[in-house]
């Protein structure tokens, strides 16, 4: 009889009920749209052996920026939705900051993979600037 209940639930016209989607899941997917192992490999393959060490340093920094973004974005999401330690206004401000950082990361990743070679020195400087900014997107008062 319990099997019958399971079958009847699965065969409902509206389908089986699904658990609510976790609002704090899948931030990695956003990053992987523009910074993944294959994109990193493409950056490392550009240019000659001489610049390989510099490109390797740049890609390692992009890895760190991306990992920090996912970790901090997930943490802030959980602060709001799970732990309730920040209100909607604080959450919205932090999300806007994370979106801005993500746009900067996307721009840098696009420049790193662009044909015609971008100015690696300028890109290194922009990446260092992004690394220097607080990854948490917290205001000084927090």
Language-model-detected regions and their locations in the chain:
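Aromatic-rich surface patch/π-platform used for binding flat ligands and interfaces
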Residues: 18-142
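Internal signal-anchor transmembrane helix that establishes type II topology
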Residues: 1-6
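Hydrophobic alpha-helical transmembrane segments in integral membrane proteins
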Residues: 13-16
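C-terminal motif of bacterial Sec signal peptides marking the signal peptidase cleavage site
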Residues: 9-10
